[in-house]
């Protein structure tokens, strides 16, 4: 425990919190342009073809971001909205693309967790048709 005189001579060190998404520069989301859209394979125990995109953000950072959901309409030069959030089994992927914003379409025929995938609510007639199929 330091004395008062020691604290006057040299103050306590501030703990600097390191951000997990530095490319967003203190913003919740950033706009960017896709420079490359491709698939990649996850780390060891998992096996899949994960859809990712290399995005040039307005903050001048070039980041790799994950495209969530089934199917997408992204290609080179698409304007996308990027949020933070890593993908545990993809090394170097620390960002997610927001579905249903800017050039990114929402996921088709999605009924649960729609807000996460940018899908509009189904019409009442469509809902009745899907209910009849379940029975």
UniProtKB/Swiss-Prot annotation:
HAMAP family on file: Ribosomal_uS12_B
Origin superkingdom: Bacteria
Record field: compositional bias (Basic residues): 111-122
Residue span of region Disordered: 108-135
Modified residues (3-methylthioaspartic acid): 89
Any one Gene Ontology cellular component term annotated for this protein: ribosome
Signal peptide positions on this chain: none
Ranges in a coiled coil: none
Organism this protein belongs to: Helicobacter pylori (strain ATCC 700392 / 26695) (Campylobacter pylori)
Name of this protein: Small ribosomal subunit protein uS12
Function text: With S4 and S5 plays an important role in translational accuracy. Interacts with and stabilizes bases of the 16S rRNA that are involved in tRNA selection in the A site and with the mRNA backbone. Located at the interface of the 30S and 50S subunits, it traverses the body of the 30S subunit contacting proteins on the other side and probably holding the rRNA structure together. The combined cluster of proteins S8, S12 and S17 appears to hold together the shoulder and platform of the 30S subunit.
